[in-house]
């Protein structure tokens, strides 16, 4: 067995003596395979005491477990089994819904939420309810134990009376027998309780995994638009599976307490009346008054939880958006704006959390104090009625009242958990009730055509759920009266302006829109590739093969066709290189080519490509088009949406769409010969821009060995050894630093000080109260009247209630402060982390920290700490009280407490590591669900949906193993600790009986009543301490983000104020001196000694092949990495001495992929509110945003797999959808389900750059995915607004920059190969620029003509 993991050396006080080292042992079988959990095959003894876990715990004490050796769950507990049961019951219940749905009933048991609840119950019916029966037996055994307490006290009374009367005392064996019987009764209850909770907790595990599996399966059947319609965006689904499903899991563990506790209370009422007669009714009358208030509190807690969920969802959505758009956030220095938004939502969430914590404190105080106050009232009434306080009756009744604390404490928790579970079921019910869509057009292999559409109308509708109180807004788009016949083997191209419906048309062919009328059928299965490439976490090979059969010949052919062979040769592990979430470590062109390779890897008779070549430069585009399009198999039908005019002449037929209708269709020659035709107008207007590219495509073949030059800079990947970081795993005990950090976050000077004072008041009253009752019964102070006894006893009871209320309330503030501080520190640290952190960390992992782990801090860990401190106080009080009466108990309890501690120490390493493994295996579930939903259209089109669903089940089964074993280990500990508790009862019982000649019956009653009441507290204390250490994993993970995530250089520096006053940079001159730059530590430099001077007001174009360092130059300029040597000067100021906030705000940046954030258009343009509306409207007019309809391009959503519109229909057409309302500054924008097309997003990106009015303007391939018309319009806007400003442009179309640039900088292998005017560089024979122009088909005359056009425009 590998010993790669080992605990740090243990301190002597953390070691369990007399244990041999088991680190060399393994849980694997002789063949090295994982075993099925031995629970089912265990002997009755091992099953009863959970001893089948002994090997697991023994090894876990010696060394950390690893996931690959843990027991597997049996096939009967597989996720597929219970997911199938759940789905079957849901469908069965849906079929039995009566006509009208039962809406007239007061309780509609056929509502979606009730159906889901009943289906959950039916899925685990026998296992769950046998656990309930066991819990009932345990509760009855516990609540009837005072009968034996009374019998023992009677025995003491009889012994005392007979001894005084000189009569023979009862046989001591009789007393010992009753003490043993009391212990056995409690022991039987312990065993039933442990197994009852085991079944309840594991039922939660089974239902949790079944819910996640079923929810993922159902939502994966929806398109992004359909999910938006049902309010099931990706962030909300992640919230559901991380929070709501976990609450149902938690509710299962405590559900049975909601009814068994009531039975306990009723039995207690009967027994108390039997002891105290009618006087008991006064105590229970007080309970009848106070306990219902708990129900109101629980209801209000439920309401508060419900109110907080929208804020939680909004916070998680804001975090997800910030992470997804982190490059935009960085280059615009928007961290503080996003932090402010997230903090506002968190504060709203915390206000409700504070109210919940204080209400919970009142509830806890009531639950614990009501029995005490009821006992006070009952005993005072009993005495006031003239009854003599009989020790047997009084102390058995006191035991009953004190035992009521457990059900009364448990009831609020149980009802709260049930309320949370009910709330979660209501939130989940909508997803489970949504009708499953029927995706895909019918396929008929017998038809002649590849695609046949006749008189069809297709549409989608998106509902806006942003404001649940208002009427839901619906946006829609339609393609009407479509009649399209695509022949088999045909190259069919689709063109059109913005809002024309090109992407919607492709989406309809893969079943992502709704066919309203008409007829549509496919002749074969279709493979689809969107324009915005989607990749999954994994290796490049995994992304291309995508779970399909391995075919090396086909694979190599696909790599060659997509020009990936040269790229793979530069990667450290070739095609086994891990590329990260959505291929974040690849350039844009590389991502697109990998996605295209995946689409064509398995030959398909019908290919649907949505403008997939726009992100490629001319060279690579030419070769890929040649091999993928022009040299495709003769029988392959290719439908291509394109903005590249030079490709149109290769089409067999072209379809021109406009405003959702087919405007014209025919061959290239036919459409060019049509006077006044749409396509002829566009081609004649913009053909000159693509002439060079057209010539290049005609050439067909490229020179051998020419590396790809598509957009983006892949240099950061060439030396990468591990692109995605594995999630950190903590080993060993939770450090003192972790506990100290958590305590410091809770403002301990205030909270802990007052907590200790209130705990002393509470515990003092708890110890003195039974002693005073004893003295009252014995008449210890003859001078005191009965009324005085009553008054003091009542005062002690009230002091307990006040002390407990203060203690719980103050600790509620501690939880509130710590939750507030930990979240604030973690999110600040993450947002200010360098971009390399996000390149190597899956976003799903980060969002999991801020969902599941924050939920644990808000609702679990603090409460666990409070309960631990309370139990410690109770244990100390119990030991003190019983030792006053029975000094020998101190010696016995010392031995047993040592056993308690050693048992806990033996258990904790295994429990801690299992919980950590559970957390580590849980993150991949969220990551897989998130990235799969983002790419669901691609997954479905490739027929990989079932593989994706199977992977999710595999992840769930993997996580269920440590989770189930963790629960089982808790029961292993509970059995042993609670049996030790019964040993304490037995010891006290035997000592009391054995000391009958030296103690009074009242003293014996105090000792017995107290030990029976608190015996479980001893075990609970150890168990709670272990549970806290297990749950501290959430604190560890968030503190890691708070303190250990690397941070960017300071965003603010002392000299920034002076630069602001000087309005730096006024000119925009840039100078780079010997700059060496790397994207992150451990990588080879991407820039190697760069020297470059950019005069103020100069327009410079960066060109070069892939990996040459173009994008890296821009990253260095805005501080998106580490400059390890050299300096960058802007207007004579070293940028390393400037705060990143000022630096990035003073450089206007327009990235290739335009991103938006949820909020208003005003928020997207100016999140800090630095500009007035007049300025914002001015830039909106300049870029054309003010004339855009708010819904004009929602149709482009169908082409994206990422719940955001694709960069498809990028041009802006004000005429489209003129009936819609125009964009205003207050128009709401949704990042995930935006109504904006990619073109509109690009214009927003341009507007937010222009509003800065910066002297330096940077465009990083900003027009790569735009059509000719929008590109032309954008260039005109830039020329008009950027005169006199320093402009740096990266462009993959060389002809688009040679005419407009004053200087050309040619990058090669991280160095400046050439820099000068276009004509000067072209004149250098053998130079890099001359070579690039030659490869692009550009000659000297082309450069002259391009410059002439720019100057004259």
UniProtKB/Swiss-Prot annotation:
Residues spanning the membrane: 40-60, 124-144, 172-192, 250-270, 271-291, 364-384, 397-417, 748-768, 796-816, 864-882, 888-907, 973-993, 1002-1022
Superkingdom of source: Eukaryota
Localization in the cell: Cell membrane
Biased composition (Polar residues): 1191-1200
InterPro entries: AAA+_ATPase, ABC1_TM_dom, ABC1_TM_sf, ABC_transporter-like_ATP-bd, ABC_transporter-like_CS, ABC_transporter_C-like, P-loop_NTPase
Bias kind Low complexity: ranges: 1208-1218
Region (Disordered): 687-720, 1191-1223
Keywords of the record: ATP-binding, Cell membrane, Glycoprotein, Membrane, Nucleotide-binding, Transmembrane, Transmembrane helix, Transport
Entry binding sites for ATP: 496-503, 1104-1111
SMART domains membership: AAA (SM00382)
Predominant subcellular localization, coarse grouping: membrane
All copies of domain ABC transporter, residue ranges: 460-684, 1070-1334
Disulfide bridges in this chain: none
ABC transmembrane type-1 domain segment(s): 129-420, 756-1030
Glycosylation, residue list: 121, 481
Entry's Gene Ontology cellular component terms: plasma membrane
Family: Belongs to the ABC transporter superfamily. ABCC family. Conjugate transporter (TC 3.A.1.208) subfamily.
Annotated function: Multidrug resistance protein; part of the gene cluster 14 that mediates the biosynthesis of a ferrichrome A-like siderophors which may contribute to organismal virulence.
Protein name as catalogued: ABC-type transporter MYCGRDRAFT_41235
């Amino acid at each position: 067995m590998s010993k790669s993991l080992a605990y740090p050396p243990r301190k002597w006080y953390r070691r369990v003596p007399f244990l041999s080292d088991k680190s060399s042992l393994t849980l694997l079988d002789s063949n090295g395979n994982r075993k099925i959990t031995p629970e089912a095959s265990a002997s009755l003894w091992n099953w009863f005491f959970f001893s089948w876990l002994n090997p697991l715990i023994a090894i876990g004490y010696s060394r950390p477990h690893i996931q690959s050796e843990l027991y597997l769950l049996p096939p009967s507990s597989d996720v597929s089994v219970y997911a199938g049961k759940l789905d079957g019951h849901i469908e069965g219940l849906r079929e039995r819904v009566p006509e009208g749905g039962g809406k007239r009933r007061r309780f509609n048991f056929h509502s979606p939420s009730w159906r889901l609840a009943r289906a959950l119950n039916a899925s685990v019916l026998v296992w769950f309810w046998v656990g309930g029966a066991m819990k009932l037996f345990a509760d009855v055994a516990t609540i009837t134990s005072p009968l034996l307490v009374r019998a023992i006290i009677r025995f003491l009374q009889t012994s005392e009376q007979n001894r005084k009367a000189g009569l023979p005392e009862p046989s001591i064996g009789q007393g010992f027998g009753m003490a043993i019987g009391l212990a056995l009764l409690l022991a039987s209850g312990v065993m039933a309780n442990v197994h009852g909770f085991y079944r309840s907790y594991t039922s939660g595990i089974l239902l949790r995994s079944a819910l996640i599996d079923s929810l993922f399966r159902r939502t994966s059947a929806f398109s992004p638009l359909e999910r938006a319609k049902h309010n099931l965006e990706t962030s909300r689904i992640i919230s559901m599976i991380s929070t709501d499903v976990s609450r149902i899991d938690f509710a299962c563990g405590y559900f049975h307490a909601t009814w068994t506790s009531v039975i306990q209370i009723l039995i207690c009422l009967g027994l108390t009346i039997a002891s105290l007669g009618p006087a008991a009714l006064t105590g229970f009358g007080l309970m009848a008054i106070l306990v219902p208030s708990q129900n109101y509190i629980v209801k209000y807690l439920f309401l508060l939880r419900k109110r907080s969920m929208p804020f939680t969802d909004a916070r998680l959505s804001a975090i997800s958006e910030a992470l997804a758009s982190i490059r935009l956030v960085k280059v615009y220095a928007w961290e503080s704006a996003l932090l402010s938004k997230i903090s506002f939502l968190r504060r709203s969430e915390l206000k409700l959390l504070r109210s919940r914590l204080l209400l919970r404190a009142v509830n806890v105080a009531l639950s614990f104090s009501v029995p005490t106050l009821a006992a006070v009232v009952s005993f005072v009434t009993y005495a006031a009625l003239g009854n003599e306080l009989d020790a047997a009756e009084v102390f058995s009744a006191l035991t009953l009242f004190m035992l009521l604390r457990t059900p009364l404490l448990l009831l609020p928790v149980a009802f709260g958990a049930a309320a949370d579970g009910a709330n979660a079921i209501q939130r989940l019910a909508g997803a489970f009730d949504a009708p499953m869509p029927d995706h895909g057009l019918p396929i008929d292999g017998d038809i002649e055509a590849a695609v046949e559409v006749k008189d069809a109308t297709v549409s989608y509708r998106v509902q806006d759920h942003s404001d649940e109180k208002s009427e839901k807004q619906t946006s829609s788009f339609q393609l009407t009266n479509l009649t399209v016949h695509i022949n088999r083997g045909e190259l069919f191209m689709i063109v059109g302006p913005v809002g024309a419906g090109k992407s919607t048309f492709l989406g309809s062919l893969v079943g992502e829109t709704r066919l309203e009328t008409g007829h549509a059928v496919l002749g074969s299965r279709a493979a689809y590739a969107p324009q915005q490439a989607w990749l999954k976490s994994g290796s490049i090979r995994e992304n291309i093969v995508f779970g399909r059969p391995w075919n090396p010949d086909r694979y190599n052919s696909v790599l060659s066709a997509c020009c990936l062979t040269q790229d793979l040769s530069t990667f450290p592990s070739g095609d086994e290189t891990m590329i990260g979430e959505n291929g974040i470590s690849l350039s844009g062109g590389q991502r697109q080519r990998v996605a295209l390779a995946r689409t064509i890897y398995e030959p398909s008779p019908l290919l649907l490509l949505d403008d997939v070549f726009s992100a490629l430069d001319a060279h690579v585009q030419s070769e890929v088009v040649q091999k993928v399009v022009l040299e495709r198999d003769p029988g392959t039908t290719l439908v291509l949406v394109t903005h590249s005019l030079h490709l149109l002449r290769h089409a067999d037929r072209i379809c021109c769409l406009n405003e959702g209708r087919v405007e014209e269709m025919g061959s290239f020659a036919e459409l060019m010969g049509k006077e006044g035709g749409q396509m002829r107008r566009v081609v004649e207007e913009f053909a000159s821009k693509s002439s060079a590219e057209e010539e290049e495509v005609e050439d067909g073949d490229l020179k051998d060995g020419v590396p790809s030059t598509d957009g983006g800079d892949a240099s950061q990947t060439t030396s990468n050894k591990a692109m995605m970081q594995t999630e950190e795993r903590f080993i060993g005990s939770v450090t003192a630093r972790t506990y100290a950090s958590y305590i410091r976050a809770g403002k301990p000077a205030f909270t802990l000080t007052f907590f200790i004072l209130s705990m002393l008041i509470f515990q003092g009253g708890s110890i003195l109260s039974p002693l005073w009752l004893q003295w009252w019964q014995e008449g210890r102070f003859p001078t005191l009247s009965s009324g005085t006894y009553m008054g003091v006893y009542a005062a002690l009871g009230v002091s307990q209630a006040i002390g407990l209320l203060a203690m719980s309330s103050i600790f509620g503030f501690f939880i509130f402060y710590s939750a507030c501080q930990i979240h604030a520190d973690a999110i600040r640290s993450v947002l200010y982390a360098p971009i390399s952190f996000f390149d190597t960390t899956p976003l799903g992992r980060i969002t999991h920290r801020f969902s599941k782990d924050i939920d644990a801090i808000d609702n679990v860990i603090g409460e666990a700490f409070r309960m631990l401190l309370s139990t410690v106080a109770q244990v100390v009080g119990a030991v003190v009280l019983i030792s006053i009466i029975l000094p020998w108990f101190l010696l016995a309890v010392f031995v047993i407490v040592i056993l308690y501690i050693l048992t806990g120490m033996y258990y904790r390493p295994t429990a801690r590591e299992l919980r950590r493994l559970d957390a580590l295996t849980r993150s991949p579930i969220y990551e897989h669900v998130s990235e799969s939903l983002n790419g669901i259209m691609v997954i479905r089109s490739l027929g990989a949906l079932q593989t994706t669903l199977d992977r999710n089940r595999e992840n769930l089964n993997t996580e269920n193993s440590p989770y189930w074993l963790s629960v089982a280990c808790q029961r292993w500990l509970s059995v042993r600790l609670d049996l030790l508790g019964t040993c304490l009862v037995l010891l006290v019982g035997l000592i009391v009986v054995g000391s009958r000649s030296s103690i009074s019956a009242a003293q014996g009653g105090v000792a017995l009543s107290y030990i029976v009441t608190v015996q479980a507290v001893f075990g609970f204390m150890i168990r709670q301490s272990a549970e806290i250490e297990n749950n501290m994993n959430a604190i560890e993970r968030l503190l890691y983000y708070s303190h250990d995530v690397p941070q960017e250089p300071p965003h603010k520096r002392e000299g920034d104020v002076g630069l602001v006053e000087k309005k730096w940079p006024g000119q925009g001159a840039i100078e780079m001196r010997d700059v060496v730059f790397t994207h992150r530590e451990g990588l080879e430099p991407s820039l190697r000694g760069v020297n470059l001077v950019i005069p103020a007001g100069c327009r410079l174009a960066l060109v070069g092949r892939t990996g040459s360092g173009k994008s890296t130059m821009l990253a260095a300029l805005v501080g998106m990495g580490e400059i390890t040597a050299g300096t960058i000067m802007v207007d004579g100021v070293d940028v390393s001495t400037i705060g990143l906030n000022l630096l990035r705000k003073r450089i206007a940046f327009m990235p290739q992929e335009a991103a938006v954030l949820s909020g208003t258009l005003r928020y997207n343009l100016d999140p800090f509110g630095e500009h007035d509306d007049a300025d914002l409207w001015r830039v909106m007019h300049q870029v054309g945003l003010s004339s855009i309809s708010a819904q004009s391009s929602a149709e482009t959503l169908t082409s994206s797999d990422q719940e955001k519109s694709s960069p498809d229909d990028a041009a802006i057409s004000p005429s489209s959808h003129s009936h819609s309302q125009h964009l205003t500054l207050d128009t709401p924008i949704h990042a995930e389900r935006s109504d904006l097309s990619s073109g509109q997003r690009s214009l927003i990106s341009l507007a937010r750059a222009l509003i800065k009015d910066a002297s330096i303007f940077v465009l990083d391939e900003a027009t790569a995915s735009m059509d000719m018309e929008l590109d032309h319009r954008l260039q005109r806007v830039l020329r008009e607004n950027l005169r006199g400003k320093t402009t740096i442009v990266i462009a993959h179309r060389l002809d688009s920059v040679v005419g407009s640039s004053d200087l050309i900088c040619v990058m090669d292998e991280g160095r400046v190969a050439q820099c000068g005017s276009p004509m000067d560089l072209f004149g250098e024979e053998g130079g890099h620029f001359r070579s690039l122009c030659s490869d692009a088909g550009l000659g000297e005359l082309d450069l002259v003509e391009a410059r002439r056009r720019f100057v004259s425009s």
